[in-house]
Amino acid sequence: GKNAIDVLVAIQQMLQNLHMDPAEVCSAKLTKMVADGGSINIIPGKATFSMDVRAQKNEVVRELQQRIEKGFNHLSQMFDVDIRWDWLDSTPGAEVSEEAAKIAELSIIEACGMDYLAPAVVTPGSDDFHFYTTKQPDLKATMIGIGADLAPGLHHPKMAFNKEALQIGVDV
């Protein structure tokens, strides 16, 4: 029979060999692989996998998805297996409105003073909270960052921050 683990490894290698424009921030990574034949001496004939595909720009995400699909088709032929996939979810890039960013800048100055205004940054990747502009293209949106002494890091199980900083966001 065919070993599903071989196909998973080939998918991983295919992702590692995807090369996009180096000026574009993007990534495609396997985040979950499950292949279980039921016993240690049974080669698994089926597997499931999940991946995280993200980029700074939504058009780059779409291009990555197209290249990944092309890779799946090639691997399907190479291993003579059926690789089925669905893009169940996506992680969009930020669509920042200059008008909304200017309003946020003025609000920060008004609420907190000029010393609290930092230069705008371009986020290097996509995130789930950018859905509002992809689902409502007419919506003008921006993001603000509030220093809140977050530690030890975002998504860490023991993440904590200064909750008093939330009032700054309310004021802005």
What are these language model-derived features?
Residues G1-E95, T123-D127:
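Midchain, well-structured core segments that form catalytic/ion-binding scaffolds
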Residues D21, M78, E110-A111, K135:
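Alpha-helix C-cap/termination motif
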Residues M51, A104, Y132:
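Hydrophobic, well-ordered secondary-structure elements that form the walls
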Residues V81-R84, I109-T123:
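C-terminal helix-coil-helix/basic helical segment that borders enzyme active sites and/or dimer interfaces
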Residues A94-A111:
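Short, low-order "capping/linker" segments at domain edges
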Residues Y116-V172:
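Zn-dependent metallopeptidase/amidohydrolase metal-coordination segment
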